[in-house]
Amino acid sequence: MSFEPTFASVSQHQVPDWFHDAKLGIFIHWGLYSVPAFAPNAGELSEILATGAWEKWFANNPYAEWYMNSYRIDGSPTQAYHRAKYGPRFNYAEFGPIFNQAVEQWDPDAWARLFKGVNARYVVLTTKHHDGFLMWPSQTPNPFIRDYHVKRNLVGELGNAVRGQDMRMAYYYSGGIDWTFNPQIVRHITDLQQAVPQRPDYVEYANAHWRELFDQYQTAILWNDIAYPSATNLNELFAEYYNQMPDGLVNNRFTQKFQMDAHGIVSDNHFDFETPEYTSFSEIRAKKWESCRGIGASFGYNAMEGPEQYQSVENLVRSFVDIVSKNGNLLLNIGPMPDGTIPQLQLERLLGLGEWLAVNGEALFDSRPWQVAEGKTDVGIDVRFTQKSDSLYATLLDTPVTTQFVLANLQAAPDTMIRVLGQSAPVTWQQREEGIVVELPVALSSAPAHALQITPQPQRLS
């Protein structure tokens, strides 16, 4: 269908099957902030969303990609670090030549092979973060800082490598903040509205970049951040994009009246999916959503983070299973070093998730939510449900110590077959009033989670 530049028209756009099927994306925060690689270890965003302690958050911001804001806040740990490390007169833009030299070592094909190997289906690269530095030599360069962009075309090179591995390539763009156009320091959540550049030259600048990203680089998603200038006719931009990329998507961060709730940004415009950050939803959502988070507490590389700041493989697996059961995707972030090296702790977690998915991915990829997301066993282990074709997948979020357990409140058909993914030994079962009694031939080896395929799908008892 052809889209017109109206809300009624663009709202007819449907989330494409590929995004429902994909489940796992890789987010990449990489830029000038990767050079200082500093942020205090102050916890995760979810804690701030729960408490509302925003002034404390921004003064002690654990997001290393916010370095340009944090080092301008008087008395902040980042300001103290910057002055001690680089001196009070060292300007943020001076990280540019350092970054440009470092990225000469980067191998985009190695990244693409890694992402494919861990079973990711799509990749989202930051093309411009809030600092305004461009990750490609755009036809619309920054008008205030000469050569304020990377010399290599990271956008184009990674796109080619990712598509060469049969994954989708998408691009993040900070339309809501650009400190080269509006240097507003963000000390509180209320400052974000004032930080959005509304000047006409920025409106043209941001719109030109988005058009470049879908005209020349075929972005699979318009992954905007924070907000967008109010003068832009977004329905026109979205219609133009959809007419070029019918299976593309628009996220919910193009809001022109900045609002937030406990799950993040609330949009006042059309969008295809929601984007809770460092949090997720507790129930199946009718609207598609994508939870984004770092492996640690920062998106950009933070050299101050250690093992205690990073999620374990077990937590990543269980969170991912929970998200998928509720109609979500996981956009899991890596924060590379300036030369493209993925820090070892991040790499270990990524590979661990991929290793689990190599055995159990069938339960998640190409699946859809079932009637309910959550279930129980009689051995105290929680269950998450997904469905595909005629099968129900029941994923245990831990390893039972016994070879017999009950999948509560399920009624199996007489011809039901049950198998544990990754095992060839047959599973026997019997029906009881409380549910399906599963009898394993041998105890399961320890793993973050175990997926069972039940065919045909059972009925719910309650």
Predicted feature residues:
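Mature catalytic domains of secreted/periplasmic carbohydrate-active enzymes
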Residues: 1-462
